[in-house]
C-alpha cells in the first residue's frame, strides 16, 4: 500500500494492479489512503463544500431493456412488478420543473426508461418543455443509453444529436447507465445495454459540444475490485483528453 501511495505522491499514473492493491487495504491502511486522498482533494478544490437543490423527474418507468438489477423499470422482466406503468405528459414534466424552480431548486434531473414508442425527438421536446417552464434551472438530463438510443432512432451521430439537445436547453449529462465499466460484468448485469466503449463515446461527444457530465459507478453486485479499477482507468483516460467530467458518484448496489 505504501509503495502505491508513494507513486501517488510522485504524481505517477497508477496501473490497474496498483489500483487493485489500494482496494485491498484494511485497518490502518485505509486511514493512510484516506489521508492522501483528503490532501489531494484539498489541493484540487479546497475546503469549500457546495450542493444543489435538485428535483428528479422520472418521466416513464416503461423500458424495453432487461437489466437484471433494475428496481425501477416496468419492462419485459418485470411486467407484474412495481405498480402501474406510467408516462408523464410534456405538460406534467413542465409543471414539475416549474414547481421545482418556484420552491428554490437549482437543478432538475431527467431520466426514465427506454420507452418503445420514443423517437429521438422526444428528448428534445422534454428539454424544450423544461427550459420553457423553468428558464433559470440547470437541466441535468438523459443517460448515455437514452442519448445513444435517441441518436440511433433518428439516424444522427452523437455530436449532432447532443448539439441539438444543448440548443434545446440541456446543461449536463448524468453518469448513470455506466453501472460498472467492465464488459465482462456488463454481459451478466445488463447484456443488452450499451457497452463500455459506447458509454465513453457518448460522454466524449457531450464534452465535445460543451456539455459537462459526471461519472457514476455502481458497486456491490457481482463485480470485483479489478472491475472497479478498470472503471476508474477508462474514465480517467477520457478525462485526461476532454476534462469534461465534473464529479464522481459511487452508487452502492
Residue ranges and their predicted role:
Residues 91-112:
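Short Fe-S-cluster ligation motifs
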Residues 49-92, 115:
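Canonical Radical SAM [4Fe-4S] cluster-binding loop centered on the CxxxCxxC motif
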Residues 11, 37, 67, 110, ...:
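Conserved, mostly hydrophobic/aromatic
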Residues 79-94, 115-166, 178-179, 194-198, ...:
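Canonical radical SAM enzyme core domain
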Residues 134, 138, 166-178, 197-253:
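Conserved C-terminal portion of the radical SAM core fold
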Residues 76-77, 107-109, 114-117, 144-152, ...:
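Conserved radical SAM core fold
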Residues 1-64:
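Flexible, acidic/Gly-rich N-terminal and inter-domain linker regions that tether
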Amino acid at each position: 500500500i505504501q509503495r502505491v501511495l508513494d507513486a501517488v505522491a510522485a504524481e505517477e499514473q497508477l496501473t490497474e494492479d496498483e489500483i487493485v492493491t489500494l482496494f485491498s487495504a484494511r485497518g490502518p491502511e485505509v486511514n493512510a489512503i484516506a489521508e492522501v486522498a483528503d490532501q489531494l482533494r484539498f489541493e484540487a478544490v479546497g475546503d469549500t463544500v457546495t450542493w444543489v437543490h435538485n428535483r428528479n423527474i422520472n418521466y416513464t418507468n416503461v423500458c424495453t431493456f432487461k437489466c437484471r438489477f433494475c428496481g425501477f423499470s416496468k419492462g419485459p422482466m418485470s411486467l407484474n412488478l412495481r405498480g402501474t406503468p406510467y408516462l408523464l405528459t410534456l405538460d406534467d414534466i413542465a409543471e414539475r420543473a416549474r414547481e421545482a424552480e418556484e420552491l428554490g431548486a437549482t437543478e432538475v434531473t431527467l431520466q426514465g426508461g427506454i420507452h418503445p414508442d420514443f423517437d429521438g425527438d422526444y428528448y428534445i421536446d422534454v428539454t424544450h418543455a423544461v427550459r420553457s417552464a423553468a428558464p433559470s434551472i440547470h437541466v441535468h438530463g438523459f443517460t448515455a443509453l437514452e442519448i445513444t438510443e435517441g441518436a440511433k432512432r433518428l439516424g444522427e451521430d452523437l455530436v449532432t444529436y447532443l448539439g441539438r439537445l444543448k440548443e434545446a436547453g440541456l446543461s449536463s449529462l448524468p453518469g448513470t447507465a455506466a453501472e460498472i465499466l467492465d464488459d465482462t460484468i456488463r454481459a451478466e448485469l445488463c447484456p443488452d445495454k450499451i457497452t463500455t466503449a459506447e458509454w465513453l463515446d457518448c460522454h466524449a461527444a457531450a464534452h465535445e459540444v460543451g456539455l459537462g457530465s459526471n461519472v457514476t459507478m455502481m458497486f456491490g453486485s457481482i463485480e470485483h475490485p479489478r472491475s472497479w479499477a478498470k472503471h476508474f482507468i477508462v474514465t480517467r483516460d477520457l478525462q485526461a483528453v476532454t476534462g469534461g467530467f465534473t464529479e464522481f458518484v459511487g452508487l452502492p448496489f
